[in-house]
Structures are given as C-alpha cells and as structure tokens.
Amino acid sequence: MYSESFSAAIFGIDGCVAHIETDISEGLPGLVLVGYLSSEVKEARERVRIALKNSGYRFPPKKITINLSPADVRKDGTSFDLSIAVAILAAFGYIDKEILKQILFIGELGLDGNIKSVNGVLPRVYTAYENGFKYCIVPFDNVCEAG
C-alpha cells in the first residue's frame, strides 16, 4: 500500500516542497524514516506513532517505510509530523489519497494527537502558494503568521 503527502522544508530563507512517500508492506513491524533528516525529524517516528495511537487509530502489524524527499535538502524541525501522519492514514485507507495532492501540511504532533505550532510557517505557506497547492493546513496557533 502506497500513499504520498506534502509538506515544506526551509532551504536558506526560502521554502521547498517536501514529498512524503509512505509504503506499507509485509515484514518486521515498525516505522522507518529515510532521507536527509535532522534528529528532530527522525524522532517523528515515535511522535507520530504515539499520536495516532492516542487518537484512536489501530493498525495491523506492518512495516511502514517513509521517504522524505528531495534527498539533497536537509529536513529540520518538527513541522513534518502532520504530513507523515496523514500519509500513513492514507496508506491504510483512512484518507482519500487523491485529495492529498492538493494539500500541503505543516505541523508538529503532540503525543496526545494535538497539532502544535512550529517555526517558519510563512515561507512554507508561500511555497505551497508558489507550487499550486489548493490548500495549506497549518497549526491553529500559526494562523496569524500564515496570513
């Protein structure tokens, strides 16, 4: 099972679209993140897993592989959590995969499943606009910054 979602990375003072690809397969159960990732992004593995569990989602024991691209741009911070969670939910059939092509997601997940504010929202939202996304989902506390 495959799905994809989108977020944005900060590259200098600009943003760039981050493509979140998720594959669900047979194998040793677990969640693996791959890409050019900071430690905060690698820690998303646990934040997302626990946030989804505490939000009431249950999944069969499967191997979940998540690739964050482009590979040549370092992904920093916690703003990818929401997009990773959405991609997992889509891969398991909870969310329509087609609608995700129109949305860029920004936000950190708390262990309780709540969406937390993040830094650098404005250049990320502008990146969504520049790249033709119809919607950009941001944390409530970042709405004023998002414009």
Regions found by a protein language model. Give the residues of each.
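Peripheral, non-AAA+ core regions of ATP-driven protein-machinery
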Residues: 1-147
